[in-house]
Each structure stands twice: as structure tokens, then as C-alpha cells.
């Protein structure tokens, strides 16, 4: 199950929570409405933040929604713009944990992967305001000649 935050293209630009499967995104709030989930609980399916805040309670309902996948709550994936899954995370930690990436980056400087790298995960705090959604255009900062992968 792929949970996404999205907006509808050429629409009101309101961020919505969805379940993405193939070429369809299921609008979870609309699905909750169709499936008769009461108004108070329905709000939990309106955003990723609300859903994650009550994860253990909402997970069974989310699975039921995905299984039912009401037609009226389906949105073609081609008609959505994916956003950052969590719109305003309080913090982001980026782990320097992919060996191939570390090896390639260090090889450019004629360095090997140090033994310490295998002993403890390295991470750094990243900018939570710089997150973007799937397939969103990455803006290259002025003066930048190349981007990392």
C-alpha cells in the first residue's frame, strides 16, 4: 500500500490523502465518507499527519478502504500532482547508508569507504522545507552545475 499526499491537477490545490495503486489514487476521505465512517473519524483520513497520529486505530479501516476501493473515490493518477507525503515534518534525518552511493562518492576523491562507516550509521539533519513529491520538478539552485543522485 502506497500512501500519498496529492492535489488534483487543474483544481482547488487542496492537499488530500490517498492510496496509490497503479494508475489510480483512492481519495481516503471520500472513501471514508462512502463507506459510512462517522464524521469525527473521517477527519483522520483527510491528511497524512492525522492518519499517522492515530495509526494503530486507522490501519484496519485503511485496509478495508483499499480492499473496497469505491469507484466514486477513485482519481486517475494522471490527474494528480504528488506532494511531499508529510507536508510539514518537524525534522528530516538523511542517512548516509547506501554503500554504493558512499563508495562512488568517495571514489571520485580517490578515497575508500572507511571501516568506521560499517560500524555506525551516519546521518545528518536535512531541511524539512525542501521536500517534494514523486515526479516533481527539482529546481537547481543558481550556480549549481550538477545535482547528486
Feature annotation, model-predicted:
Residues 15-17:
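Extracellular disulfide-bonded cysteine-rich modules/repeats
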